[in-house]
Design a protein with these regions (language model features):
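Hydrophobic/aromatic residues within well-ordered alpha-helical segments
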Residues: 57, 61, 65, 79, ...
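Hydrophobic alpha-helical connector segments
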Residues: 56, 67-98
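Short alpha-helical scaffolding segments that buttress acidic/His motifs in well-ordered protein cores
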Residues: 86-90, 99-103, 142-149
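Amphipathic alpha-helical packing segments from all-alpha helical-bundle domains
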Residues: 66, 92-101, 107-140
Length: 173
């Protein structure tokens, strides 16, 4: 069993890891306790029930995702560099695909994902406006590409494919 007391945040982090590796069914007291070498009693000390864990995991992810957007807004660099950096960070994110899959079966997750995506779209619209692309539908196309590119099993890396899209936008200006 665990030799140190597990915090609520450690349970949430374990839930995030389990979601990425095993999917939503792994977000339950028993498998998480087993993974952490803890008892279910420790789980229930921090969470009323499994849905409370789900809510905490979703809120934690949403908070981190929104913080990443805020950090991106604060970072230096021209719009091109910022767009490329956003794309690279997005395709490297292992949590986003797991939450997208979970959103198909959970309205709570779907709502949180929608909120995060709306902020991402706002950020992309602003970046693209600075690059001379005024059609907000293109921001949606960019986000759609970033969501889908990691799913393709091609020879081109997702970041490289997104950078090619950015190159095309810059060439067409």
């Amino acid at each position: 069993m665990a030799t140190q007391r597990l915090t609520r945040q450690k349970w949430i982090d374990a839930g995030l890891d389990a979601l990425i590796l095993k999917g939503p069914p792994a977000l339950a007291a028993e498998p998480l306790a087993r993974d952490l070498g803890a008892t279910k009693g420790s789980f229930y000390w921090h969470f009323k029930d499994v849905p409370a864990l789900h809510e905490a995991v979703v809120k934690d992810w949403q908070s981190r995702a929104l913080s990443q957007i805020a950090e991106a807004l604060a970072k230096e660099g021209n719009s091109e560099k910022r767009l490329r950096r956003f794309g690279a960070q997005f395709v490297a994110d292992k949590q986003d695909p797991a939450f997208r899959a979970w959103a198909h079966t959970s309205p709570m997750v779907a709502d949180a994902l929608s909120d995060v995506d709306q902020e991402r779209l706002t950020y992309l619209v602003n970046l693209l406006n600075h690059l001379g692309v005024r059609n907000p539908a293109f921001a949606q196309s960019c986000l759609g590409a970033l969501i889908g590119l990691p799913q393709l099993q091609g020879q081109t890396k997702p970041t490289q494919a997104f950078d090619t899209m950015v190159d095309l936008v810059l060439a067409l200006k």
